[in-house]
Design a protein with these regions (language model features):
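Short, surface-exposed beta-strand/loop micro-motifs that present aromatic residues
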Residues: 64, 155-171
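Positively charged n-region of N-terminal signal peptides that target proteins for export
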Residues: 1-4
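Aromatic-Pro/Gly-enriched surface loop or interdomain linker
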Residues: 17-73, 77-80, 176-179, 185-213
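Short alpha-beta junction capping motif
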Residues: 21, 73-112
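Acidic, glycine-rich loop-and-strand cores that form catalytic or ligand-binding grooves
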Residues: 116-147
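Bacterial N-terminal signal peptides
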Residues: 6-13
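Extracytoplasmic/secreted envelope proteins and their assembly/folding machinery
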Residues: 36-43, 89, 93, 111, ...
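Solvent-exposed loop/turn segments at secondary-structure junctions
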Residues: 26-30, 79-83, 101, 108-112, ...
């Protein structure tokens, strides 16, 4: 088993220089497939404006698959239920502590499910609010006030929570912002251009942070 995980770590170390992102598919019945144009649009924005060279063919990977180790950044979203099996949780934990990064964007209604399931991934860690002076808010574009507000749901302020491993932010949970809606094609939500621009810029920060840390 140790040899197996050593192999995975070596594999991840080798490919972490590649610029790849993927959508994380999970169990539980939640719509992991929501916002289908979001990640492709963010990738194109990053390639155009922050000098990345990300593969624009976005793949989908399952939480329990070793395929996740091919991607320095995983994106997860949805509105409803999330379930991680013990194998899923162990696989995600190994991925994250080996250098991977997971961005979870609550598309509205995901919070109570994902917070419970993350306790399986990191039983001894809590989601903590990320301070506004953290590097993720300034890697490519400055957001001195933290996350931008993209969509109104409950009228609450946007929040960024994270889990840290050995001082490195390995997981970002964005709540009450709906960044992914702002990344989607303009006609999907009819967001004003300046709102979509804020969402894409914050997304570019997340991508840049994940690739460089």
């Amino acid at each position: 088993m140790k040899l197996f995980f050593s192999f995975l770590f070596s594999l991840f170390y080798f490919i972490s220089f590649a610029q790849e992102v993927a959508i994380l598919k999970y169990k539980g019945g939640g719509d992991w497939y929501s916002n289908p144009t979001a990640l492709p649009n963010l990738v194109k924005y990053c390639n155009d404006y922050i000098d990345t060279n990300i593969n624009e063919n976005i793949k989908t990977v399952e939480a329990g698959s070793t395929d996740i180790f091919q991607f320095p950044l995983l994106h997860m979203t949805g509105h409803g239920n999330v379930f991680f099996s013990d194998d899923d949780a162990e696989n995600l934990r190994n991925y994250l502590v080996s250098g991977g990064f997971l961005h979870i964007d609550d598309n509205y209604g995901m919070e109570p499910y994902i917070t419970k399931e993350l306790k399986k991934v990191f039983p001894n860690s809590e989601l903590i609010e990320i301070p506004k002076n953290h590097a993720i808010f300034s890697t490519a574009y400055n957001f001195p006030n933290g996350l931008p507000k993209i969509h109104e749901h409950d009228g609450k302020a946007p929040k960024a929570f994270g889990i840290f491993h050995e001082s490195r932010l390995v997981l970002l949970f964005t709540l009450e912002t709906d960044l992914g809606d702002g990344w989607e094609d303009e006609e999907v939500h009819n967001d004003p251009e300046e709102v979509r621009e804020k969402a894409l810029k914050m997304g570019a920060n997340i991508v840049k942070y994940a690739f460089e840390n």
